[in-house]
Amino acid sequence: MPSVDDLDHYIAAAARAVDQWVDGHIPATRDVVPIGFSQGGAVAVHLLRMHPERYRAVINLSGFLAPAGVPGTAPADDRLTDFEIPVYFGYGKNDAVIPKYELFAAAAWLEEHTWLTTKSYRGLDHAVSLDEFSDIRQWLVLHDIASGVL
């Protein structure tokens, strides 16, 4: 497991790379909803912590949060609540990869900083399920994020 500082740097660097790609390839008028699983979930949430005005919502599946103890790695944390960005956070109750305290800490932080919907799935390990995808579909429709695709 990387040190706390290393984790901050790694997640922030990955989020910066995704954010730069989005900036260079997706028109600013298009809604962007990052979705990530595990470390990808941490990166998806971190995009909000860096550039919340660019992202319409986030879906974090069995992810965690970078601690943001290194100055400058999460520059928008202090203003994130102003945006009320919808976040879906789902995880398996039997996840043996991400410690429960990390999942609960992520849920608590997201509850405080975003418009959070969280759901845990009985019997699900560090994985995703059809039930979870069904719930995400409903959540996208509820928040008018479907754009006619669903």
Language-model segments: which ranges?
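Active-site signature of alpha/beta-hydrolase-fold catalytic machinery across serine-
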Residues: 46-50
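A conserved short beta-strand
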Residues: 53-68
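Serine-hydrolase catalytic machinery in alpha/beta-hydrolase-like enzymes
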Residues: 1-31
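Acidic catalytic loop of the alpha/beta-hydrolase fold
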Residues: 67, 93-98, 125-127
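Conserved serine/cysteine hydrolase catalytic core
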Residues: 66-86
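C-terminal catalytic histidine-bearing segment of alpha/beta-hydrolase fold enzymes
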Residues: 101-150
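Short beta-strand/loop motif that positions the catalytic acidic residue
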Residues: 83, 88-91, 95
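Gly/Ala-rich beta-loop-alpha elbow adjacent to hydrolase catalytic centers
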Residues: 35-40, 44
